[in-house]
Amino acid sequence: MGVCGYLFLPWKCLVVVSLRLLFLVPTGVPVRSGDATFPKAMDNVTVRQGESATLRCTIDDRVTRVAWLNRSTILYAGNDKWSIDPRVIILVNTPTQYSIMIQNVDVYDEGPYTCSVQTDNHPKTSRVHLIVQVPPQIMNISSDITVNEGSSVTLLCLAIGRPEPTVTWRHLSVKEGQGFVSEDEYLEISDIKRDQSGEYECSALNDVAAPDVRKVKITVNYPPYISKAKNTGVSVGQKGILSCEASAVPMAEFQWFKEETRLATGLDGMRIENKGRMSTLTFFNVSEKDYGNYTCVATNKLGNTNASITLYGPGAVIDGVNSASRALACLWLSGTLLAHFFIKF
């Protein structure tokens, strides 16, 4: 804001006005807020970015001249506008009040503003400080990330605002009330576990407006483990189903074996069906030769695991090792090579 807006005035008029203002606000005059001889001290004005700020100066009939300044820049002198900023307008100029408005306030408008008056040939001033508040805004946040279990992870969330916002990280994929993680721009997780996967929420708050919230997803890879594998009893001629459930990220791939033979859909009236975490081996018409131990193998890029499941008939004793036909299944997996040995004893 400056005096250049009146360069279109005749130069003589400009000189006269300049001299009058020099007389009005002489160099070295101290700022006095709350002076007993000044009509009224002014409180600080606080507005949000984008709103309008009204600066009010209470005066009386002793005032002969009055002006508003921003630091050393003249905005208005009486009804004469010196600022070239179209956002600055005069609201009231009466014997009791002299007020201006700054529209669409921005952060660079923040600072001291001075109301200067001339009374009884003595200049007096009162200062008001304009405070501009800015809602919180997250400017930079980490992207979604995939890591292996046991790795270290650092998430970043940078936010701006006035006052400076408080940044909080929270894990959303846990029970309510247990999701608080940290109150910092950086979230560091060492030796990450599979139950620490999921969405993490960054919230920036400064009480000026609603918090700015962004989310980051962490995917934790881990090798398979079989969570459900149950022996099944069924009579000859009936339908029998063996099921095998495995948790893994990425999703596990399943294979079924009986002794040293890898099974496939269509082999001897069997069907293998894989759906997500579950794999089933279905016998549509169980015969005596179908009874025995079967091995479910779950594999992903981080490792493998297996479980032995028994299909048995009526009267069979199953206690983990069949008393009629004890067996030990051993599996070695390396890359895509899988060797299967079935040892009876």
Swiss-Prot record:
Lipidation (GPI-anchor amidated asparagine): 322
Positions glycosylated per UniProt: 44, 70, 140, 285, 293, 306
All copies of domain Ig-like C2-type, residue ranges: 39-126, 136-219, 223-310
GO biological process, one term: cell adhesion
InterPro entries (alphabetical): Ig-like_dom (IPR007110), Ig-like_dom_sf (IPR036179), Ig-like_fold (IPR013783), Ig_I-set (IPR013098), Ig_sub (IPR003599), Ig_sub2 (IPR003598), IgLON_domain (IPR050876)
GO cellular component, one term: plasma membrane
Subcellular location: Cell membrane
Membrane topology field: Lipid-anchor; GPI-anchor
Alphabetic keyword roster: Cell adhesion, Cell membrane, Disease variant, Disulfide bond, Glycoprotein, GPI-anchor, Immunoglobulin domain, Lipoprotein, Membrane, Repeat, Signal
Gene3D superfamilies in UniProt: Immunoglobulins
Disulfide bridge map: 57-115, 157-202, 244-296
Disease: Ovarian cancer: The term ovarian cancer defines malignancies originating from ovarian tissue. Although many histologic types of ovarian tumors have been described, epithelial ovarian carcinoma is the most common form. Ovarian cancers are often asymptomatic and the recognized signs and symptoms, even of late-stage disease, are vague. Consequently, most patients are diagnosed with advanced disease.
Protein known as: Opioid-binding protein/cell adhesion molecule
Gene: OPCML
